[in-house]
A protein has these predicted regions:
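Structured aminoacyl-transfer and RNA-binding surfaces used for tRNA recognition/handling
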Residues: 1-192
Length: 194
């Protein structure tokens, strides 16, 4: 905790001048069969960091437990640059703003994900990535299998954003991805113990 608070000082946020709170926020990724204890760190009421102690991955206990510290860099910069809007952040010393770098991509990907993604093609892509991942798991090729699993998960997220997956279907899709993840973990762990 002390090391983390010192890191805030290094980037220009003096913890003595702000209301810093550690708020319990355990993490879970059902598609990955992953979970862990976690905390959000709030600065003056806004989340700026997430701590996660990964205790389970693909349904397996993590030994040892690993930790991830995720700084919400844009939010940290909002404090250090004293900005209320992320798009007003300076991106570089030449005066280029965050909006100039990222706004178009955010608009276009939002339009794609929520309005224009071809549902029929995405359903086929999900099946294709799932099939490829299963085939690679059978061949005991873990990393490309995991890559295909991540692609299937990404397609699932777009389908979910489009609102085409019912509650019952959602559970089924999550289970399908988790099954692949577990298979990948089994062959990975097996390869590491040889």
């Amino acid at each position: 905790k002390k090391l983390y608070l010192n890191s805030l000082s290094v980037v220009g946020i003096n913890p003595k001048n702000h209301d810093i709170r550690f708020v319990e926020d355990d993490w879970e990724s059902p598609t990955l069969g992953a979970a862990g204890l976690g905390w959000e760190v709030w600065c003056d009421g806004m989340e700026i960091t997430q701590f996660t102690y990964f205790q389970q991955m693909a349904g397996y206990e993590c030994k040892p437990v690993s930790v991830e510290i995720t700084y919400c860099l844009e939010r940290v910069c909002m404090f250090t640059q004293q900005q209320k809007n992320v798009y007003d952040l300076l991106w570089n010393d030449e005066g280029v703003k965050y909006k100039e770098v990222f706004h178009q991509a955010e608009k276009e990907f939002s339009a794609y994900n929520f309005e224009h993604a071809n549902i029929d093609d995405l359903l086929k892509m999900f099946d294709m990535h799932e099939s490829e991942a299963k085939s690679l798991v059978e061949k005991k090729i873990s990393l490309p299998a995991y890559d295909q699993c991540l692609k299937a998960s990404h397609v699932f997220n777009i389908l979910d954003a489009r609102g085409v997956i019912s509650v019952a279907q959602r559970t089924g899709y999550i289970g399908r991805i988790r099954d692949i993840t577990k298979g990948v973990a089994e062959i990975w762990l097996s390869s590491q113990t040889k």
